[in-house]
Amino acid sequence: MKKSVSVKFDRRRKYYLILDCETATLPCADGLPENEKKKIAIAKPLIYDLGWTIVDKKGNIYLRENYLISEIFSVPSIFNTAYYAHKRPLYLEKLDKGEIVLTDWRTAVSRLEFALSITEAVGAYNAMFDFKKAIPFTELYINQLYSADFHKWLSFQAECCERIVNDTVIGNNKEFDPNCFRFRSKEYPLFDLWGLSCQYLLDNDEYKKACLLNGWQTESGKYFKTSAETTYRFISGQMDFDEAHTAIDDADIESEIFALIVKRAKNQVEIGIEYFPFRILGTVRKFVCQHPEFADMVNLEF
């Protein structure tokens, strides 16, 4: 993984922000069955670990920043809802070593706003979640937390969560722009490393064969896995690589993925979010029908 090469920014150079976050959710989800908690966690994410890198097109890292958000991490009823809540000792160790900063949301976001101000575009592996759900909902939560109506708002959110669990959510008519991250009255061009990886790195026979040989299929068996973890395994040749699922470590590998995408895309950074990008690769069934030598390795009963 490439290390930071500088902390000085040349305005003539083009920089890009690669962001990752780890999230919990509202305390009303605690104690629910895992499938119900997952629904709420996807719809109502609260960021406790926020990290990003600033890179150039070659993947050189000019800045790495990583923050634990005190309003989420330091509140057990919220942090305990996190899928990776068992990593709490790891974060405490990072704090002791000075590898991460514990601060409030508004302080962390002020640093993020600076980073956004010097970059050409921003992205993440699954930008839809990070930029369209996690950051906006955490911003909303924090604003409500410091308002007089917080408990009333939280009760309303509990009702919303009940509808989510029961699949009775009313449709959202808010305008959605797949090319833009809007935050605090400003707009930033947005790219999605997941979709770009599927397009430029993974939609080939070599990757699909690697998926079959290593069992990288979705839970249903219908599609090939296209996660940041399997993508990094493939491009690095480190087939035993396990994603850290901590924000800054994941942002590091995503910075390498970004650099290879740009190289394959002839030095272009394509803006926008592709819906369901894993479909770009086609189904496992279709690939196996074209390559019958793999038929004995997969279950096509789906």
Q: Whereabouts are the PLM-identified features?
A:
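Conserved non-catalytic scaffold segment of RNase H-like nuclease domains
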Residues: 2-139, 170
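Acidic two-metal-ion nuclease catalytic site recognized across multiple nuclease folds
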Residues: 2-8, 212-223, 234-235, 248-302
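Short, charged/polar N-terminal "headpieces" of proteins
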Residues: 7, 18, 23-29, 42, ...
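Short, function-defining helix-loop hinge/capping sites that tune catalysis or transport
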Residues: 28-30, 134, 200-203, 258
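Active-site-proximal helix-loop-helix substrate-binding element of RNase H-like nuclease domains
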Residues: 74-93, 167, 171-181, 187-251, ...
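Short, polar/flexible loop-turn hinges at active-site or ligand-entry regions and domain interfaces
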Residues: 95-101, 145, 238-244, 268
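Short mixed-charge
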Residues: 142-185
